[in-house]
């Protein structure tokens, strides 16, 4: 396991002293690579909290330029960057905030051509993509390569969060065999709502990496931020799921040799 420098020991001291966390959990964070798809109010904020927590390597994937109407929730962006690729600004900001973190910026969307290489490069994936086309690609690739994925999405004042562990929990296709009605661009959102969900998303990733606490395993967390109500419901695998079911072409994959950084017990 990688060693921590004296600077890192001081930088992360307040989380290292958490009961049950310690230096070993911090070393696991430093050793980890996390893929973040979507660098918006959700993905960008989650990436920020992973960077300041000491995750060793982040892979950011997002095509498209920053728009002015993104700015109510883009805490890594600045006004002078409107019209430019947001993923490069995010990389620069994260490296400025924590120079010990390696950040790779990929100016592209998740596609059938790149999804497998992206997933194979990471230990954990954060699904913060802005449409279900990309989400479905990520889900299938994570199932193929046995990589855990934190799944987070929101619509207005509602949000959901779950952690997908291939072979253990339901996959995204089990949970949403049909596209939810909120799968559309241009929905209204408050920055504080996306930020709330982003923090929980980053926390789930840290749980997976460190084993410090139990992630949402086979549970779907739903949030109504109008009323500040949170509910968890049990979720179940669908044996007939086209992605992770018994006869799926995606699972099991003959090359599923990648390690999963999770204590699923």
UniProtKB/Swiss-Prot annotation:
Transmembrane spans: none
The UniProt record lists the keyword Lyase: no
This protein's UniProt keywords: Nitrogen fixation
CDD domains registered for this protein in UniProt: ThiF_MoeB_HesA_family (cd00757)
GO molecular function: nucleotidyltransferase activity; thiosulfate-cyanide sulfurtransferase activity; ubiquitin-like modifier activating enzyme activity
Gene Ontology BP term (one): nitrogen fixation
InterPro entries: ThiF/MoeB/HesA, ThiF_NAD_FAD-bd, Ubiquitin-activating_enz
CC terms in the record's Gene Ontology section: cytoplasm
Pfam families, alphabetized: ThiF
Similarity comment: family membership: Belongs to the HesA/MoeB/ThiF family.
Protein name, UniProt field: Protein HesA, vegetative
């Amino acid at each position: 396991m990688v060693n921590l420098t004296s600077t890192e020991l001081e930088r992360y001291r307040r989380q290292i002293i958490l009961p049950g966390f310690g230096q070993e959990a911090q070393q696991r964070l430093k050793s980890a690579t996390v893929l973040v798809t979507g660098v918006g109010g959700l993905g960008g904020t989650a990436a920020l909290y992973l960077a300041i927590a000491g995750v060793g390597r982040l892979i950011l994937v997002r095509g498209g330029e920053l728009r002015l109407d993104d700015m109510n929730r883009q805490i890594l962006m600045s006004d002078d960057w409107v019209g430019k690729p947001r993923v490069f600004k995010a990389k620069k900001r994260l490296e400025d905030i924590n120079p010990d973190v390696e950040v790779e910026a990929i100016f592209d969307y998740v596609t059938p051509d790149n999804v497998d290489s992206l997933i194979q490069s990471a230990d954990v994936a954060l699904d913060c993509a802005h449409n279900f086309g990309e989400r479905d690609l990520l889900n299938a690739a994570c199932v193929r390569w046995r990589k855990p994925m934190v799944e987070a999405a929101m619509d207005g004042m509602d949000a959901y969060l779950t952690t997908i562990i291939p072979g253990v929990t339901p996959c995204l296709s089990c949970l949403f065999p049909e596209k939810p009605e909120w799968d559309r661009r241009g929905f209204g959102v408050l920055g504080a709502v996306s930020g709330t969900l982003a923090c929980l998303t980053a926390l789930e990733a840290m749980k997976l990496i460190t084993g410090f606490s139990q992630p949402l395993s086979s549970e779907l967390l739903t949030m109504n931020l109008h009323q500040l109500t949170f509910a968890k419901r049990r979720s179940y695998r669908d044996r007939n799921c086209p992605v992770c079911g018994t006869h799926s072409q995606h699972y099991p994959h003959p090359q599923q040799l990648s390690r999963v950084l999770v204590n699923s017990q």
